[in-house]
Amino acid sequence: MPRANEIKKGMVLNYNGKLLIVKDIDIQSPSARGAATLYKMRFSDVRTGQKVEERFKGDDILDTITLTRRFVDFSYVDGNEYVFMDKEDYTPYTFTKDQIEEELLFMPEGGMPDMQVLTWDGQLLALELPQTVDLEIVETAPGIKGASASARSKPATLSTGVVIQVPEYLSAGEKIRVHIAERRYMGRAE
């Protein structure tokens, strides 16, 4: 089992009975001699999506696990269940609407490329989306000419129903690229 100073972003830990994906690591070096370096790690709970923060000393032993990641395509909706199909062996993976509520906010009709399901020991854990998605603005205040010089923003409703802040010069009908985790406008879609 690795020490805390060997943990990298994207690894999965089994800690206090929870499966946690490492999202970010801050290294804090103490100024006093002999004091241990601290590793402040931010996690996302694989099962609940809840954000968790923990501190470890560099020589703390941590229990890492290996998740199986499979690329999937969205297949169909059956009542309250969303079915995804493995791209290689066509295994169906089923999630309830509650399990993937956050992901559905960014998933265009028909799905999107590079979606993955995470499994561990045969147990379905989570649906993972790519970092960005291209969506169309369906409703926002009209674009203001000459507003590109200002950094002001306005709310915009996207084709999936999610509302994010966009620059003032954008108008309805334009396709934009959105950073999913941060719910942030990144630029116009190509």
Curated annotation (Swiss-Prot):
GO biological process terms on file: peptide biosynthetic process
Domain of life per record: Bacteria
Gene3D superfamilies xrefs: 2.30.30.30, Nucleic acid-binding proteins (2.40.50.140)
Listed SMART domains: EFP, Elong-fact-P_C
Cellular component, GO annotation: cytosol
Pfam families given in the database record: EFP (PF01132), EFP_N (PF08207), Elong-fact-P_C (PF09285)
GO molecular function (one): translation elongation factor activity
Annotated family: Belongs to the elongation factor P family.
Identification of the protein by name: Elongation factor P-like protein
Species whose genome carries this gene: Cronobacter sakazakii (strain ATCC BAA-894) (Enterobacter sakazakii)
